[in-house]
């Protein structure tokens, strides 16, 4: 055991060993407390090496470590603007509601069951293919669905999230799509796009991800929104991924990978559209909104129209008419 610690210390302090340092650091996290409990003389040496490796950069950090190190949010004065949600009486949403028979699909249950039914409908009818981008033409449910059928293909997470947002809005459920962005966005282009839907019964937003048919709950089965999931990841609080979560009905998802790896990486910055409607971006004949990104204090995301560190403002409730 002590020889193992000596080897790990050498790797953690060696030059040009980034490719090895990460694996050895994770092993050292397990070994160090054992050595400490045994009063081994190698415990302090290993701890010093771990601290040195940590100071060199993020190659030793897990994705969850990086999220936990994130600066906090604040209560800066909010923007003088409000999120907008298209009404189901909107011309395009009425067409969507009728064409896809959304009232029947949503069902007559409570709002949570309706949200889940629509989540599964989009997931089951438009496959995910991250390499295929968005459907050519209008960024709406009809065009994306018809294009996927016609070309026997899938589209990326953004396309699916835009479709689910439109589906929810069409039946009168306020919704937004959220682009989840990693800290290292300059070199890591792998973001993920999900939706949030407003639950009147819970009086809060809930996370719904059409790519993976996924939602997240606490230990009491209460659905959570991305901000709550982010906080719970940072503080090691219980998170439960629904059993049905999967990729294209072929690969089951687990909380360890989906939440603690994939989404832990992608919950560093959160971007959303101010105007939430059918065809919220891309080719469209109607005015479109600006984007705003929720950023930790002291950081900015330059691709957004606005940045804010006011978490309360970002997750504000929709005005229900």
Q: Locations of the language-model features?
A:
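Structural helix-adjacent loops and short alpha-helical linkers that scaffold large soluble proteins
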Residues: 40, 44, 106-110, 203-205
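Alpha-helical protein-protein interaction scaffolds
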Residues: 4-49
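Secondary-structure boundary elements
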Residues: 54-155
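Low-complexity, Gly/Ser/Thr/Pro-rich intrinsically disordered linker/tail segments
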Residues: 235-321
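A structural signal for well-ordered alpha-helical segments within the folded catalytic domains
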Residues: 116, 155-166
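Hydrophobic/aromatic-rich core segments of domains that either
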Residues: 162-238
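Short His-Asn-centered micro-motif
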Residues: 153-157, 178-180
